[in-house]
From Swiss-Prot:
SUPFAM superfamilies: Heme-dependent peroxidases. Bifunctional enzyme with both catalase and broad-spectrum peroxidase activity. NCBIfam families: cat_per_HPI (TIGR00198), PRK15061.1 (NF011635). The active site is at 109 (proton acceptor). This is Catalase-peroxidase. Belongs to the peroxidase family. Peroxidase/catalase subfamily. Binds 1 heme b (iron(II)-protoporphyrin IX) group per dimer. The record marks 105 as: Transition state stabilizer. GO terms for cellular component: cytosol. GO terms for molecular function: catalase activity; heme binding; metal ion binding. Keywords: Heme, Hydrogen peroxide, Iron, Metal-binding, Oxidoreductase, Peroxidase. It comes from the Bacteria.
């Protein structure tokens, strides 16, 4: 039976033209403040583990970038880029008729965010396209550089990532101006959303807030001590001297114009970015051989950065109201001028000018502090846009720093007297700068990738010269490992210790290479428990490898991981679940000579919640971060999701993979058995937690009724019960039906960690052509 609806009834239909919302105000929509971060600023942001997931990627999980890139005519691509570099468009004309210097800056600033402390930053995912990096003051007008490249990006489509295009364009720019580049490797996969997790410093800048802007530029929050004092140091894990700068303030600390103070900042900053003194000088002197700095308009007159620009700007920021806003009116960092008489030619004029002349301070049209030669007869540099117009040479305070610092000066003098050495040093330092975060050479794509050279910063691994073991040999090796009498706990601890050094930020660490047996890792306090296990496994390796005639061998690196498989299988079996743990052989053992001690020392954990480790000095550190936040950071570096993080921790506690073998967090009476006891006891409503120390670092789990202490634990344990998101996952395993799911999920997460560094395995992750 049909029903007639009275359309005049306003309880059913809104009147025409009336807002569907009640009332006459709309206060907000999804994502508008205030949000959780405003209400509860100290909450653990577990959701950051899920950023840049497949849901954000329009290309989907089956897109094979390596295969698509291989279809590109690489030489044709480079010709397209080089043809563009020597062109010019009216809306953003090229300096000197050459976009090369501008593109070098774009590529440099894309790569220059890299820092060795946690491996984050760098050019690897093209994050210069997103906030906050896109809108840092030091990245002024890089938005124009990327927009100029848009036609080339569209021509090659998804076969060429933005991350690769930016670096390759920088390489092409160097080549057309005369520098023989060391090489170029593609293989960078674009991010599809902003990085909302990386810690870039304590400063917060709100538009229109003078006090917060002062917080940014005065540096006091990230630096300790005074420049020149013995305790002068930069907060970890930071590398940049200022918020929103790539390296240092070119006018000197606090825009002081002090070259020696600038040199101190340069050394700290470039060291934090994994560069030594020679590489630092090569990069600064090499980069400043090209182009010019722009400072024709006071900064206060420049519009907001891309992230704050009006919608019609379409992602372009820093609107300049002076003249055309571009060309001869361009404003970028406020300093105006060029370092050399021929800014589009690779030569030694930068160093020649720096040392030949005495320099005096002056001001740019924008008011920035800079330096000009005292000698009125010093060479001039041509205007970038007005034919026949000449200008004095320019140096920044950070350039004069290379002359006044004794150690930097020695390097400068070496390069000044040997242009070939300078050329090679800059070429190799540029390659390192732009490839530092790419990881092993197995990820490298393209005909110009440097594969043969054993560059120490690439953490090289020797080529395998033996046949891999098969199923029969693996079974025999498992029996041999079991026969050693090594416990489930010791085997699991050792395997996880080796594999969990991996960090996806710069693709370093992991079990491949067997570096757990080498300095510095073998000497870390957190790894002390692994030493006897490694020695026992060496014996298994020697017995297996010696005297074989079939060419098959096993590496120590593989045996360490296989030992973990033995432990997990046994622990699951004892819990009533029979399950195989995947094992993929092929890891090799590297040598001490191929291990950079200083660079690997940065992988040493201060806090490792997986192994319930907190460095002895952590409590004495000046810090604003908790152990559980450091634990979350570690989970992110291991690419773990919140469920993977949770199930791994629960399983490792059941196995007792604590660094010292203590029972903290081992919430079970069946140690070494892969049970869900950790989750059941953690969430048991009949038990209550109490602080066991004044700092709230350790806790006692007591029976509510009797007050008897049952277990002890740390913040890295309690977080899985105190954080709502993690507790919801813990509940999924604590239930009566959780055991089999727990074992299955633990095995998957375990294998994921063991395989994170296996870029040599074809099809395992997105790899380059060396994968076999």
């Amino acid at each position: 039976m049909s029903e007639t609806i009275d359309k005049t009834d306003t309880t059913t239909f809104h009147m025409e033209g009336k807002c569907p919302f009640g009332g006459d105000r709309i206060g907000g929509a999804l994502g508008n403040r205030p949000t959780l971060e405003n209400w509860y600023p100290h909450r653990l942001r577990v959701e950051v583990l899920h950023q840049n997931g497949l849901a954000a990627d329009p290309l989907g999980p089956d897109f094979d970038y390596a295969a698509e890139f291989a279809k590109i005519d690489f030489e044709a691509l480079k010709r397209d880029i080089k043809q563009f570099l020597t062109s010019s468009v009216d809306w953003w004309p090229s300096d000197y008729g050459n976009y090369g210097p501008q593109m070098i800056r774009m590529a440099w600033h894309s790569a220059g965010t890299y820092r060795i402390a946690d491996g984050r930053g760098g050019a690897g995912t093209g994050l210069q396209r997103f906030a906050p990096i896109s809108s840092w003051w030091d990245n002024g007008n890089t938005d124009k550089s990327r927009r100029l490249l848009q036609p080339i990006k569209h021509k090659y489509g998804n076969a060429l990532s933005w991350a690769d295009l930016m670096v390759l364009t920088g390489n092409c720019a160097l080549e057309i101006m005369g520098l023989p580049t060391y090489g170029f490797a593609a293989g960078r996969l674009d991010a599809w959303e902003a990085d909302n997790a990386t810690y870039w410093g304590p400063e917060v800048v709100e538009m229109g807030s003078v006090s917060s802007f002062d917080d940014m530029v005065n540096r006091d929050k990230r630096w300790r001590g005074k420049n020149g004092d013995a305790d002068y140091d930069l907060e970890n894990p930071l590398a940049a001297s200022h918020q929103a700068l790539i390296y240092v303030n070119p006018e000197g600390p606090y825009a002081s114009g002090d070259p020696l103070a600038s040199a101190r900042d340069i050394r700290i900053t470039f060291t934090r970015m994994a560069m030594n003194d020679e590489e630092t000088v090569a990069l600064i002197a090499g980069g400043h051989a090209f182009g010019k700095s722009h400072g024709m308009t006071p900064a206060k007159e420049i519009g907001p950065p891309p992230e704050m620009a009006p919608m019609e700007a379409m992602g372009l920021g820093w609107h300049n109201p002076k003249g055309s806003g571009a060309g001869k009116d361009t404003m970028t960092n406020g300093i105006e001028g060029s370092w050399t008489p021929d800014p589009t030619k690779w030569d030694n004029a930068y160093l020649e000018n720096l040392f030949r002349f005495e320099w005096e301070q002056t001001r740019s049209p924008a008011g920035a502090l800079q330096w000009t030669p005292k000698d009125p007869d010093a060479p001039k540099t041509p205007d970038a846009h007005v034919a026949g117009q000449m200008h004095p040479l320019m140096m920044m305070t950070s350039d004069i720093a290379l002359k006044v610092d004794p150690d930097y000066r020695k390097v400068c003098e070496k390069f000044l007297n040997d242009f070939d050495a300078f050329t090679q040093a800059f070429s190799k330092a540029w390659y390192k700068l732009t490839h530092r975060d790419m990881g092993p050479k197995h990820r490298y794509l393209g005909p110009e990738a440097v594969i043969e050279d054993g560059l120490l910063w690439q953490d090289p691994l020797p080529e395998r010269d033996y046949a891999l073991v098969g199923e029969a040999e693996i079974a025999a090796l498992k029996q041999a490992i079991a026969a050693t009498g090594l416990s489930v706990s010791d085997l699991a601890f050792t395997a996880f210790s080796a594999a969990s050094t991996y960090r996806d930020s710069d693709k370093r660490g992991g079990a491949n290479g067997g570096r757990l047996a080498l300095a510095p890792q073998k000497d870390w306090a957190v790894n002390r428990r692994a030493a006897p296990v490694v020695e026992a496994l060496r014996g298994v390796m020697a017995t297996f490898n010696d005297g074989r005639s079939d060419g098959k061998k096993i590496s120590l690196a593989d045996l360490i991981v296989l030992g973990g498989c033995v432990a997990v299988e046994r622990a699951a079996r004892d819990a009533g679940v029979e399950t195989p743990v995947p094992f993929t052989p092929g890891r090799v053992d590297t040598t001490q000579a191929l291990t950079d001690l200083e660079m690997f020392e940065w992988l040493k954990p201060v806090v490792d919640g997986f192994r319930n480790y907190v460095d002895d000095g952590f409590g004495q550190m000046t810090r604003s971060v908790s152990p559980e936040e450091m634990f979350l950071d570690k989970a992110n570096l291991l690419t773990l999701t919140a469920p993977e993080w949770t199930v791994l921790t629960g399983g490792l506690r059941a196995l007792n993979a604590n660094h010292d073998g203590s029972n903290r967090g081992v919430l079970t009476d069946r140690v070494g058995v892969l049970t869900t006891d950790f989750f059941r006891n953690l969430t048991d409503v009949d038990l209550v937690w109490e602080k066991a120390d004044a700092d709230g670092m350790t806790f006692a789990l007591k029976d509510r009724a009797s007050g008897q202490t049952k277990f002890e634990a740390t913040r890295s344990d309690l977080v899985f019960g105190s954080n709502a998101q993690l507790r919801s996952i813990a509940d999924a395993y604590a239930g009566s039906d959780g055991q089999r799911r727990f074992v299955a999920d633990f095995v998957k997460a375990w294998d994921k960690v063991m395989m994170l560094d296996r870029f040599d395995v074809k099809g395992h992750r997105r790899y380059g052509p060396m994968a076999a």
